[in-house]
Amino acid sequence: MKIIHLILGKANPERMNGVNKVVHALATQQHRAGLDVAVWGITADLTDNYPAREFATRLFPARRNPFGLAPALAQALRQLAGAGPAVVHLHGAFIPVYFTVARRLAALRLPYVLTPHGSYSPAALRKSRLAKLVYQRLFESYLLRRAARVHCLGESEVVGVRALNPRLATALLPYGFEPPQAVVPAAPAAPGRFRVGFCGRLDDHHKGLACLLAGFAEFAHQVPAAELWIIGDGPDRARVDFWAEAAPAGSVQLLGSRYGDEKIGLLGQLDVFAHTSHYEGLPTAVLEAVALGVPCVVTEATNLGSYVRDFGCGEVLAAASPTLLAAALHRLHARWLAQVPGSSLAPHCRDMVATAFCWPRLLPAYQQLYQQALAA
């Protein structure tokens, strides 16, 4: 069986886009397991400007018409249909070209799995609600109906998918995560500070940044040694700058986009990682920090709440609330101050990633998902 991951972009792990990171990791692990896997990317830039990788990659030009399918991609799909058993794995949702791809796959009798990566969670659907409602009825409903399985990364997505169409065949399965190697930072931060961190795209509607800044400000006014490191960039950078003014002067540091060892070196110096998203598929940044032994504060909307509770590696907020965040930070700060032997949450954090997000344990479930798609 051949597995084709089809995405917008190039599956470049050195981008802030979480879908790129997930697809890169999944394809890498499948290749290492001896599976016949490739990534096909639709992009306006056909340059191979990404790090060396183990799996095959083909890039196809994006068309000016968002529904347009490049002739080269149409031909590649025809060749795939005649080359034996194959499953196409689509990543993302509300992508016009996927409607065209789905129609072509149906005509070629090629099964496909769709992973929306958080796009069908209730909070995500509320953004541009009217436009999405119209688009869903005209185009997205076809994509969903024809999917052999809709692969959900978290429970919030299952709820969203069932609200769109309760008859759809869903599969709930997280992706795995390969823990990064700890990095000694080039310029270690001064000791004695309680460092809270965030890493991701600066998009308030998605990431709940107003809550993050307000909750931290409330906390920091009572804990003068607190700092907030914000790693990333995005459309709400100016708003984050403004919201940071509510915190004590100098306590919020906007570090911009960081990648590779530089990012890992920063994450490893944190005492808490905070992720107050309104919706997610499964946020890679949280797993990166937790794998380094950093406790976390997450909202239920991250789809990580059950894991954090089960492994005891942080705090879970029912919703993105500044008051709830401040209270959670106070509890974690109290543990940090106590420094009682055996009280560190770091072992629990590492155990969560090594157990619940272990690729060798999850890959058979992905294979079963593809076999079900072939049999559908």
Tell where the protein language model's regions lie, with residue ranges:
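Membrane-proximal helix-turn-helix segments that form the acceptor-binding/catalytic region
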Residues: 107, 132-150
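Nucleotide-activated donor-binding/catalytic signature segment of Leloir-type glycosyltransferases, i.e.
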Residues: 240-258
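Conserved acidic donor-binding segment of nucleotide-sugar-dependent glycosyltransferases
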Residues: 310, 315-323, 331-337
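Aromatic "clamp/platform" in nucleotide-sugar-dependent glycosyltransferases that forms part
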Residues: 278
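Conserved donor-binding/catalytic core segment of Leloir-type glycosyltransferases
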Residues: 4, 188-207, 213-217, 229
